[in-house]
Curated annotation (Swiss-Prot):
Keyword Protease among UniProt keywords: no
Site feature location: Important for substrate specificity: R12, T70, Q154
Chain's role: Nucleoside triphosphate pyrophosphatase that hydrolyzes dTTP and UTP. May have a dual role in cell division arrest and in preventing the incorporation of modified nucleotides into cellular nucleic acids.
UniProt-listed Pfam families: Maf
Protein name per its UniProtKB record: dTTP/UTP pyrophosphatase
Record GO terms (molecular function): dTTP diphosphatase activity; UTP diphosphatase activity
Cited NCBIfam families: maf
Catalytic activity from the UniProt record: dTTP + H2O = dTMP + diphosphate + H(+); UTP + H2O = UMP + diphosphate + H(+)
One Gene Ontology cellular component: cytoplasm
Family: Belongs to the Maf family. YhdE subfamily.
Localisation per UniProt entry: Cytoplasm
Enzyme class: hydrolase
Matches recorded under CDD domains: Maf
Amino acid sequence: MSKLVLASASPRRRELLARLGLPFTIQPSRIDESVYRHLPPAARVEALALAKARAVAAGLTDALVLGADTLVVCEGRVLGKPDSPAAAARMLAFLSGRTHTVYTGVAVVQAPRGPEGVTHARTAVTFRHLTPDQIEAYVATGEPLDKAGAYGIQGRGALLVAGIEGDYFNVVGLPLVQVEELLAIFGVDVWGRV
Protein backbone atom coordinates (compact mmCIF):
# COMPACT_ATOMS: atom_id res chain seq x y z
CA MET A 1 0.00 0.00 0.00
CA SER A 2 1.16 3.52 -0.74
CA LYS A 3 1.88 5.73 2.23
CA LEU A 4 -1.29 7.50 3.45
CA VAL A 5 -0.98 11.23 4.16
CA LEU A 6 -3.64 13.39 5.81
CA ALA A 7 -3.56 16.90 4.32
CA SER A 8 -4.97 18.54 7.44
CA ALA A 9 -3.81 19.98 10.75
CA SER A 10 -7.18 19.25 12.38
CA PRO A 11 -6.81 17.19 15.55
CA ARG A 12 -10.37 15.92 15.06
CA ARG A 13 -9.62 14.62 11.57
CA ARG A 14 -6.43 12.99 12.86
CA GLU A 15 -8.37 11.23 15.64
CA LEU A 16 -11.10 10.06 13.27
CA LEU A 17 -8.72 8.76 10.61
CA ALA A 18 -6.83 6.86 13.32
CA ARG A 19 -10.05 4.94 14.06
CA LEU A 20 -9.67 3.17 10.71
CA GLY A 21 -6.50 1.50 11.98
CA LEU A 22 -4.35 2.60 9.05
CA PRO A 23 -0.88 4.09 9.48
CA PHE A 24 -0.67 7.65 8.19
CA THR A 25 1.35 10.82 8.43
CA ILE A 26 0.17 14.41 8.56
CA GLN A 27 1.15 17.17 6.17
CA PRO A 28 -1.18 20.19 6.33
CA SER A 29 -1.98 21.90 3.05
CA ARG A 30 -1.60 25.58 2.29
CA ILE A 31 -4.14 26.81 -0.25
CA ASP A 32 -6.10 30.00 -0.87
CA GLU A 33 -9.62 28.98 0.11
CA SER A 34 -11.14 32.31 -0.95
CA VAL A 35 -11.07 31.40 -4.65
CA TYR A 36 -13.82 28.82 -4.02
CA ARG A 37 -16.29 31.10 -2.21
CA HIS A 38 -18.49 31.47 -5.28
CA LEU A 39 -19.32 27.75 -5.39
CA PRO A 40 -22.42 26.24 -3.77
CA PRO A 41 -21.68 24.35 -0.52
CA ALA A 42 -21.39 20.75 -1.80
CA ALA A 43 -19.27 21.79 -4.78
CA ARG A 44 -17.17 24.07 -2.58
CA VAL A 45 -16.24 21.42 0.00
CA GLU A 46 -15.39 18.95 -2.78
CA ALA A 47 -13.25 21.53 -4.62
CA LEU A 48 -11.46 22.54 -1.42
CA ALA A 49 -10.83 18.94 -0.34
CA LEU A 50 -9.41 18.17 -3.78
CA ALA A 51 -7.27 21.33 -3.84
CA LYS A 52 -5.84 20.50 -0.41
CA ALA A 53 -5.03 16.92 -1.42
CA ARG A 54 -3.49 18.04 -4.73
CA ALA A 55 -1.34 20.68 -3.02
CA VAL A 56 0.22 18.10 -0.72
CA ALA A 57 0.40 15.34 -3.37
CA ALA A 58 2.40 17.58 -5.71
CA GLY A 59 5.41 17.33 -3.40
CA LEU A 60 5.23 13.58 -2.75
CA THR A 61 5.77 10.29 -4.54
CA ASP A 62 4.03 6.97 -3.98
CA ALA A 63 1.49 8.31 -1.50
CA LEU A 64 -2.27 8.53 -1.18
CA VAL A 65 -3.19 11.99 0.05
CA LEU A 66 -6.49 12.57 1.85
CA GLY A 67 -7.91 16.09 1.92
CA ALA A 68 -11.08 17.30 3.62
CA ASP A 69 -13.04 20.49 4.12
CA THR A 70 -16.13 21.25 6.22
CA LEU A 71 -18.74 24.00 5.94
CA VAL A 72 -21.76 24.83 8.07
CA VAL A 73 -24.71 26.39 6.24
CA CYS A 74 -27.86 27.79 7.83
CA GLU A 75 -30.60 29.50 5.84
CA GLY A 76 -28.20 30.15 2.97
CA ARG A 77 -25.51 31.64 5.20
CA VAL A 78 -22.10 29.94 5.31
CA LEU A 79 -20.62 29.86 8.80
CA GLY A 80 -16.88 29.36 8.96
CA LYS A 81 -14.64 29.47 12.00
CA PRO A 82 -15.35 32.49 14.21
CA ASP A 83 -12.55 35.03 14.44
CA SER A 84 -13.37 36.11 18.00
CA PRO A 85 -15.47 35.10 21.01
CA ALA A 86 -18.02 37.77 20.04
CA ALA A 87 -18.30 36.28 16.53
CA ALA A 88 -18.75 32.81 18.06
CA ALA A 89 -21.56 34.11 20.27
CA ARG A 90 -23.29 35.68 17.25
CA MET A 91 -23.05 32.42 15.29
CA LEU A 92 -24.44 30.38 18.16
CA ALA A 93 -27.31 32.83 18.67
CA PHE A 94 -28.10 32.57 14.95
CA LEU A 95 -28.06 28.73 15.08
CA SER A 96 -30.18 28.59 18.25
CA GLY A 97 -33.43 26.73 17.60
CA ARG A 98 -32.61 26.25 13.92
CA THR A 99 -31.59 23.36 11.71
CA HIS A 100 -28.38 23.79 9.75
CA THR A 101 -26.47 21.59 7.32
CA VAL A 102 -22.89 20.41 7.71
CA TYR A 103 -21.08 19.55 4.48
CA THR A 104 -17.72 17.80 4.40
CA GLY A 105 -15.86 17.13 1.19
CA VAL A 106 -13.33 14.31 1.08
CA ALA A 107 -10.76 13.74 -1.66
CA VAL A 108 -8.03 11.18 -2.27
CA VAL A 109 -5.19 11.84 -4.72
CA GLN A 110 -2.49 9.37 -5.75
CA ALA A 111 0.75 11.36 -5.55
CA PRO A 112 2.24 13.06 -7.34
CA ARG A 113 -0.41 13.58 -10.06
CA GLY A 114 -2.23 10.29 -10.29
CA PRO A 115 -5.89 9.32 -10.18
CA GLU A 116 -8.24 11.27 -7.94
CA GLY A 117 -11.49 10.60 -6.15
CA VAL A 118 -13.80 13.07 -4.43
CA THR A 119 -17.15 12.98 -2.66
CA HIS A 120 -19.01 14.71 0.15
CA ALA A 121 -21.35 14.01 3.05
CA ARG A 122 -24.23 16.12 4.27
CA THR A 123 -25.76 16.08 7.76
CA ALA A 124 -28.64 18.11 9.20
CA VAL A 125 -28.12 19.33 12.78
CA THR A 126 -30.85 20.93 14.87
CA PHE A 127 -29.86 23.15 17.78
CA ARG A 128 -31.78 23.52 21.00
CA HIS A 129 -33.13 26.96 21.86
CA LEU A 130 -30.18 28.47 23.69
CA THR A 131 -30.28 31.15 26.35
CA PRO A 132 -27.79 34.02 26.29
CA ASP A 133 -26.25 32.57 29.47
CA GLN A 134 -25.75 29.17 27.82
CA ILE A 135 -24.13 30.79 24.80
CA GLU A 136 -21.85 32.91 26.99
CA ALA A 137 -20.83 29.90 29.10
CA TYR A 138 -20.07 27.78 26.03
CA VAL A 139 -18.04 30.53 24.37
CA ALA A 140 -16.08 30.96 27.62
CA THR A 141 -14.86 27.33 27.31
CA GLY A 142 -12.89 28.36 24.20
CA GLU A 143 -14.18 25.28 22.39
CA PRO A 144 -16.02 27.12 19.59
CA LEU A 145 -13.10 29.24 18.40
CA ASP A 146 -11.47 26.79 15.98
CA LYS A 147 -14.56 25.13 14.54
CA ALA A 148 -16.83 25.87 11.60
CA GLY A 149 -20.18 27.00 12.97
CA ALA A 150 -18.60 27.76 16.36
CA TYR A 151 -19.30 24.42 18.01
CA GLY A 152 -17.82 20.98 18.49
CA ILE A 153 -20.44 18.24 18.65
CA GLN A 154 -17.84 15.84 20.06
CA GLY A 155 -17.23 18.10 23.07
CA ARG A 156 -19.38 20.28 25.28
CA GLY A 157 -21.06 21.49 22.11
CA ALA A 158 -23.06 18.25 22.23
CA LEU A 159 -25.23 20.02 24.80
CA LEU A 160 -26.31 22.53 22.15
CA VAL A 161 -27.72 19.88 19.82
CA ALA A 162 -31.33 18.69 19.87
CA GLY A 163 -30.76 16.11 17.13
CA ILE A 164 -28.97 15.15 13.94
CA GLU A 165 -30.00 13.46 10.72
CA GLY A 166 -27.10 11.84 8.94
CA ASP A 167 -23.49 11.00 9.72
CA TYR A 168 -22.25 12.12 13.14
CA PHE A 169 -18.61 11.83 12.04
CA ASN A 170 -19.32 14.24 9.19
CA VAL A 171 -20.24 16.87 11.78
CA VAL A 172 -16.99 16.18 13.65
CA GLY A 173 -15.09 16.76 10.38
CA LEU A 174 -14.42 13.48 8.57
CA PRO A 175 -17.19 11.19 7.27
CA LEU A 176 -15.58 7.79 7.78
CA VAL A 177 -17.88 5.84 5.44
CA GLN A 178 -16.96 8.10 2.52
CA VAL A 179 -13.27 7.89 3.46
CA GLU A 180 -13.43 4.09 3.53
CA GLU A 181 -15.23 4.00 0.16
CA LEU A 182 -12.69 6.33 -1.48
CA LEU A 183 -9.72 4.44 -0.08
CA ALA A 184 -11.21 1.17 -1.37
CA ILE A 185 -11.20 2.62 -4.91
CA PHE A 186 -7.43 3.05 -4.50
CA GLY A 187 -6.99 -0.53 -3.26
CA VAL A 188 -6.84 0.17 0.47
CA ASP A 189 -8.76 -2.51 2.37
CA VAL A 190 -9.70 -0.92 5.68
CA TRP A 191 -11.58 -4.05 6.75
CA GLY A 192 -8.55 -6.25 6.18
CA ARG A 193 -6.56 -4.10 8.61
CA VAL A 194 -9.03 -4.07 11.52
